[in-house]
Amino acid sequence: MSARQKKTVLRTVRISEELDRILEKDAKVHRTSVNALMSSIMGKYAEWDRYTEKFGHIAIPTALFRALLELIDENALATLAERVSVELTNEISSFWFKKINLETLLQFFSIACQYGKAGEIEIENEGRNYTITVYHEYGKKWSIWLQHYTDKVIRTTVKAIPQFETTASTLTLKFEVP
């Protein structure tokens, strides 16, 4: 059984007719079953929502997020990313995973991208060498934030020195675990 295949249980739930219509409609739009859609919704709750509620996360429209980023000076943004990165990541990772190491750090990055919409992430590794690529739609300043945030976290948590390549929509970082 692969890591992605998990043992399932049959659970019956009672929902309103209105909610059923909404789920049917959305499942059809996404070309999936209502069962798969509900499983996805519950997965997001289990992996993201129930934790982020405790940390005061908020959801804002992408246009507003981009506009706020544009108002911030690049140096101030970099300083802020470095200042909050380790404390925030350690606090959340400790709460979610009960420990902080390379594995939980990568899980945190993946979940933050998947549910927090930080970007689309790809993580590759060959032995001790890691390459992490984040594709996003938030512009150059988000790439700056991600670079300074991940640089500080990886140097502190993994004790590795990452190398970066950034564009307005991509951050790629490479590092070797000591």
Pin down the residues of each PLM region.
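An N-terminal amphipathic alpha-helical segment
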Residues: 62-131
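Generic N-terminal amphipathic/basic segments
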Residues: 58-62, 66-72, 153-155, 160-165
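Short Lys/Arg-rich basic patches
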Residues: 1-17, 27
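Polar/charged, Gly/Pro-rich intrinsically disordered segments
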Residues: 166-178
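Short, hydrophobic/π-rich interface segment
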Residues: 122-167
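Short, charged/polar micro-motifs that form catalytic or ligand-binding hotspots
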Residues: 13, 28, 136, 140
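Short, basic amphipathic alpha-helical segments that act as recognition/interaction helices
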Residues: 22, 32-56
